[in-house]
Regions:
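Generic recognition of cysteine residues
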Residues: 64, 94, 131, 156, ...
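Short amphipathic alpha-helical "interface-anchor" segments enriched in bulky aromatics
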Residues: 170-197, 232-270
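Long, low-complexity, polar/charged, intrinsically disordered or flexibly structured peripheral segments
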Residues: 200-241
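Mature extracytoplasmic/luminal segments of secretory-pathway proteins
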Residues: 61, 153, 175, 190, ...
Length: 270
């Protein structure tokens, strides 16, 4: 069946649902699911040693390609499996759980390489301006953060893939530790000389009874808000400037489960 016809039908349905207020692009999530080719080389009961050799193209499907399906993108699990086939990339409205756009590629195509094409194609008929884009760490690529911000004034909620980070020690993970060994609290941001700085304050500054463990002079200055203050410059890199430990990040990222639910329903349809 002609894929263009199916795509037009889906586009018409999305526009109708949007008009009815059922589909929205405020929170959109992208994920892919493997689609195995109908070939004996994908049979788990087959013990041929060369069935996943790149040059051993299945005769039953000359278009499929060799891909790798990881067990999870949520953790650092090493479990994965090879397969011959395709990938179905689906952009989902994470509020209604309904699909907005679909693209099928061969299995070797990396998820992140088609993300911007999918967003652009969606935006051409259903605007995604001011969206919050949710994806797993397979999409943790600097260009995606920048393009979502620049083209759509959007925001990315994507976990950090440490394999893409040259120096994890420079990341804004955790709060600075004061001289007393306590984790300091965030106390707002401000811009200064073209840079954004995060302010941190003493966690005991408002306490009336607690004493500073190291008896720091700043804690006994007689002021209402006492204790030490520190400032850290937030990186200009959008990817590294996200506080992934914040409630804001975690609550928004939890909406991405709608992508997994959709993929589960897709697989159950056969």
């Amino acid at each position: 069946f002609d894929n263009k016809i199916l795509s037009e039908i889906m586009k018409t349905q999305v526009l109708f649902l949007s008009k009815e207020g059922i589909v929205d692009t405020s929170f959109i999530g992208l994920d892919s699911t493997p689609v195995s080719a109908n070939t004996s080389q994908n049979n788990p009961k087959s013990f041929l040693s060369n069935k996943f050799k790149p040059g051993n193209q299945p005769r039953a499907d000359s278009d499929c390609r060799l891909g790798v399906h990881t067990a999870s993108n949520q953790t650092n699990e090493k479990k994965y499996e090879f397969y011959w086939g395709y990938k179905n990339h689906v952009l989902v409205d994470c509020i209604s759980g309904l699909p907005i756009y679909e693209m099928t590629t061969t299995a070797e195509v990396h998820d992140a390489t088609v993300a911007l094409d999918i967003l652009a194609a969606t935006h051409s008929f259903q605007p995604i301006t001011d969206c919050i884009f949710l994806a797993d760490k397979g999409y943790d690529v600097k260009n995606i953060y920048n393009q979502v911000k620049e083209l759509y004034n959007g925001e990315c909620i994507i976990p950090l893939n440490k394999r893409n980070t040259k120096n994890p020690k420079l990341l804004p993970q955790g709060n600075p530790i004061c001289e007393a060994g306590l984790a300091m609290w965030k106390d707002g941001k401000f811009s200064d000389c073209g840079r954004t700085r995060q302010k941190f304050c003493c966690p005991l500054k408002s306490s009336k009874d607690t004493l500073c463990p190291c008896h720091h002079k700043n804690f006994y200055n007689g002021k209402k808000h006492r204790g030490c203050t520190r400032y850290l410059t937030i990186p200009d890199d959008l990817r590294l400037s996200i506080d992934r430990d914040s409630k804001y990040f975690k609550s928004n990222y939890s909406l991405r489960t709608e992508c997994e639910r959709y993929n589960s329903r897709f697989k159950n349809t056969g």
